[in-house]
Amino acid sequence: MSVTVEILENLERKVVLSLPWSEINAETDKKLKQTQRRAKIDGFRPGKAPLKMIAQMYGASAQNDVINELVQRRFYDVAVAQELKVAGYPRFEGVEEQDDKESFKVAAIFEVFPEVVIGDLSAQEVEKVTASVGDAEVDQTVEILRKQRTRFNHVDREARNGDRVIIDFEGKIDGEPFAGGTSKNYAFVLGAGQMLPEFEAGVVGMKAGESKDVTVNFPEEYHGKDVAGKTAVFTITLNNVSEPTLPEVDADFAKALGIADGDVAKMREEVKKNVSREVERRVNEQTKESVMNALIKAVELKVPVALVNEEAARLANEMKQNFVNQGMTDAANLDLPLDMFKEQAERRVSLGLILAKLVDENKLEPTEGQIKAVVANFAESYEDPQEVIDWYYADTSRLQAPTSLAVESNVVDFVLGKAKVNKKALSFDEVMGAQA
């Protein structure tokens, strides 16, 4: 099969496919005879309409189908013969100069995967993040858990920061009510930042039954465009004040956290174990991000546009599905521009190609034991870990995510062994405040 692969721009290639008319006509005749056997045409018994009539009715579409099928088949035959690593799907175009009457020519335009060459990793710098969990961090976490279980009890006094208040309010701009500016029995916690600072400051010091007018200046960057940069006067009536009460760290508190016998020491150990696992996950994520950045720097790579577009479309669909899951049912019909995902998509495709090369060259495929360890780590935070483990192994397709994580872990360890490693110790607050 003699064809010439023409190099276009970047990773784009072009081949001209030649389809003999004799083959096209023979395949078209076969398809028309198949159609004849199935055809139900008025005036004829099923399958008995003349072939000439079938050809008149369906000949053009049958020939078009045959050409499409032959083009696809011929292209992939060429790709195999020429050892072309095709990325994405080819685009087929007609050739204007059909100078050979014996054949029909079609141009296939496609991209190929780039040659990935890993640079000198010893020249790259990466950060290995560390953090520790001790008694102070356990105390801090227990305090957070206490606050999450805060109870509010009614009090007959003026409102203070930290209190939960229930109010009626009516806002006006230039003497006119505005959308979203009125509510009855609206509850919020003073000092939690749920309302604008001027609004909250106006409520502090009020007692139940009192009313007052409070002037509020909406910031220019306020999310409500109709009121952004404007001044409103709110008439506020305070209906109820409740002060927060935190639970004691005792047996009842421990039982509420799942410690059956209410042993506080056991509870603290469980808290430490869970927090340590989360801290480890987050520092590993930050270290992995540093490693991935180093790999991007170490490899000069042009990525196939087709793969970037596919990944961008996948990210757009993922975002829409997340919106739907949050209750925004109309989000499924959102027309999200793919350009907003292009940078992220290009990075993901690049890393996918780099990691595949690195794993293949350095035999970094995970062992069965490594995959099991990832699954066990997933399962550890559940009430019945064995049930979770069994779920993963009931369907091997569910092991894709644990396998990918095991691969990434091997890659991170490999790069850390080659690159210049700068250790970076973070505080508990820095780790838990990081997005991971």
UniProtKB/Swiss-Prot annotation:
It catalyses: [protein]-peptidylproline (omega=180) = [protein]-peptidylproline (omega=0). It holds the Pfam family FKBP_C. Keywords: Cell cycle, Cell division, Chaperone, Cytoplasm, Isomerase, Rotamase. InterPro entries: PPIase_dom_sf, PPIase_FKBP_dom, Trig_fac, Trigger_fac_C, Trigger_fac_C_sf, Trigger_fac_ribosome-bd_bac, Trigger_fac_ribosome-bd_sf, Trigger_fact/SurA_dom_sf. Residues 162-247 form the PPIase FKBP-type domain. It is found in: Cytoplasm. One of its GO terms (biological process) is protein unfolding. One of its GO terms (molecular function) is ribosome binding. GO terms for cellular component: cytoplasm. Its EC number is 5.2.1.8. Its main location: cytoplasm. The keyword Cytoplasm applies. HAMAP family: Trigger_factor_Tig. Involved in protein export. Acts as a chaperone by maintaining the newly synthesized protein in an open conformation. Functions as a peptidyl-prolyl cis-trans isomerase. Belongs to the FKBP-type PPIase family. Tig subfamily. Consists of 3 domains; the N-terminus binds the ribosome, the middle domain has PPIase activity, while the C-terminus has intrinsic chaperone activity on its own. This is Trigger factor. It comes from Neisseria gonorrhoeae (strain ATCC 700825 / FA 1090).
